[in-house]
């Protein structure tokens, strides 16, 4: 799920130095703008043939799942038991795992990449270690220290950098819900991953419009849409896939058929309604493991179907937790 991310996030991903300035041309383009929920796993959902890799990756997260092919069945079951205890403690602690608790666990594992990126940002940008990230801290670490009125005097294309700075500040102000110019961890998460927060939806749409609306009429025309995907060489025939994109624009992007995209249509495109994948998988695991059909799972029921949840060397899909269980 993506559009052009903030300069700060690009900086983190590229591992620039604290004073290194970002490229004005940085950022993904084209179809990468669309913020769609990533699948819980790229593996086929093929339980009928004993392939539980999809379920393992959905339950544990893909990165952790890869680490556990070497576990014995006994190790897998023991560690799964600890996960079951933790799922219940995170909920109502009644000794059972409800559908809501199972869904919350799966959603938690799937958000690990977001938590990791925020932790990296936090460690880098909370320079005074006061437990908050101020706009001044973030700005200076990202763009460098400048005296007032001298911003970017030492770089080419200073105007582009000024626009980037203004854009990041605007996003920060929207993420900073209490308006104190100091980001809590939740507010920094909204800054880095605005697609995850309903109150940030308008800023994602505004940034996308600014990127694509070259004639500044407030809309995305079909040629502006195509220009973000494809740049033709002189004399080059337009590829078939570009023609397909034009048709996609007319048939599926331009909802009211007026020939261009307004803000609402841009939002529908880059932030489409998403299926609750963790809930779908939680329902599946509950259905397959709830032997007494009481609508909840006991620890015994989960361990009785342990190879669907985690596996081991014995199944060739072992995937639980070489991380300490408190990290999951």
Swiss-Prot record:
Q: Which residues bind Ca(2+) 2?
A: 126, 128, 130, 132, 137
Can you tell me which residues bind Ca(2+) 1? 92, 94, 96, 101
Q: Residue numbers of motif Prevents secretion from ER?
A: 325-328
Give the record's PTM text.
Degraded by PCSK6 and other endoproteases including FURIN and PCSK5.
- The positions flagged as glycosylation sites are 140
Would the keyword Metal-binding turn up in this protein's UniProt record?
yes
Residues engaged in binding Ca(2+) 5: 254, 256, 258, 260, 265
> Which residues are Ca(2+) 4-binding?
213, 215, 217, 219, 224
Where are the annotated segments for Disordered?
Answer: 19-49
Ranges for domain EF-hand come to: 75-112, 113-148, 163-198, 200-235, 241-276, 277-312
Please state where this protein is localized.
Endoplasmic reticulum lumen
The record ties this protein, via PROSITE patterns, to: EF_HAND_1, EF_HAND_2, ER_TARGET
Q: Which GO molecular function entries does the Swiss-Prot or TrEMBL record give?
A: calcium ion binding
Q: What is this protein called?
A: Reticulocalbin-3
Record lineage: Eukaryota, Metazoa, Chordata, Craniata, Vertebrata
* Annotated gene: RCN3
